[in-house]
Amino acid sequence: MQTSALLLAAQALVASAGLIERQSCPSIHVFGARETTVGPGYGSAGTVVNLILNAYPGSTAEAIVYPACGGQSSCGGISYGNSAMQGTNAVASAVNSFNQRCPNTQIVLVGYSQGGQIMDNALCGGGDPGSGITNTAVPLTASAVTAVKAAILMGSPRYRAGFPYNVGTCTAQGFAARPAGFVCPSGSKIQNYCDSPDPYCCTGNNQAVHQGYGGVYGQAALTFVRSKLNSGGSPPTTPPTTPPTTPPTTPPTTPPPSGSCAALYGQCGGQGWNGATCCSQGTCRASNQWYSQCL
């Protein structure tokens, strides 16, 4: 009799713990990924992350933990390609793990520059040869893909003109562009923002444009996210806030072998650059102290 009572009490505790865990899951959870050379946190992705959090009280967010590096000493000298590969794995791990804990929570992905590249890789698959990712499978589980309702990518080097989810004026491509004809199975969930003067997602030379997408397209991004989420959100109770950021840079993938010239749109110079300083096509133009590009 006493044993049965103890058994029932134990079962009740287990059920209660499960109920508490389920109740602690938010209706909406946002993952944000920062750009290259910015310290841990959301970086410029924070603008859109905060817009969503303010629009949906009770929603939660977390930053993807990854190097966000491009060979600079300030971030450990990790190459851009290796950083993007680690970041892609980090997105898959974080999103899959969260979805396993909270299967009914709607997920939104927000990635800026290199952060956009790793979100794109994780959601769309297709591999990323420049980052050493040869497996073309989507690294998110089927359940996690279903839970992801919207993805906002800004200034992503994977941008290529002509994709149905593109937004902006760029008619070219980024330095790590998707191959022509690529089809993302979750394309209807994506908005990919890129304007023509951007030197990283496009072929321009204006760093300020690369850093300005949150201010230019933030409200449009929020409108898109609202259209994709199942539950309506009340208007923001406080004005959206934008965390302070330091101007980052997003250099391209591993330098070409010394002795050869960089290809069109490739890197040809910059502080700490040890690769080619000539261009097989175009002219080497400096965008900033870290990055010169063949244009």
Swiss-Prot record:
GO biological process, one term: symbiont entry into host
Catalysed reaction, written as an equation: cutin + H2O = cutin monomers
InterPro entries assigned: AB_hydrolase_fold (IPR029058), CBD_sf (IPR035971), Cellulose-bd_dom_fun (IPR000254), Cutinase/axe (IPR000675)
N-terminal signal peptide: 1-17
Region (Disordered): 228-258
Bias type Pro residues, positions: 236-258
Active-site residue numbers: S113, D198, H210
Keywords for the protein's UniProt record, in alphabetical order: Disulfide bond, Hydrolase, Secreted, Signal, Virulence
CBM1 domain: residues covered: 260-295
A GO MF term: carboxylic ester hydrolase activity
Changes after translation: The 2 disulfide bonds play a critical role in holding the catalytic residues in juxta-position; reduction of the disulfide bridges results in the complete inactivation of the enzyme.
Localization (cell): Secreted
Result, substituting H210A: Loss of enzymatic activity and attenuates virulence
One GO CC term, this protein: extracellular region
Pfam families: CBM_1 (PF00734), Cutinase (PF01083)
Effect of deleting the gene: Normal cell population growth and colony morphology.
EC number(s) from the headed UniProt entry: 3.1.1.74
Family designation: Belongs to the cutinase family.
Record function comment: Catalyzes the hydrolysis of complex carboxylic polyesters found in the cell wall of plants. May degrade cutin, a macromolecule that forms the structure of the plant cuticle. May also degrade suberin, a specialized macromolecule found in the cell wall of various plant tissues. Allows pathogenic fungi to penetrate through the cuticular barrier into the host plant during the initial stage of fungal infection. Involved in pathogenesis.
Protein name listed in UniProt: Cutinase 11
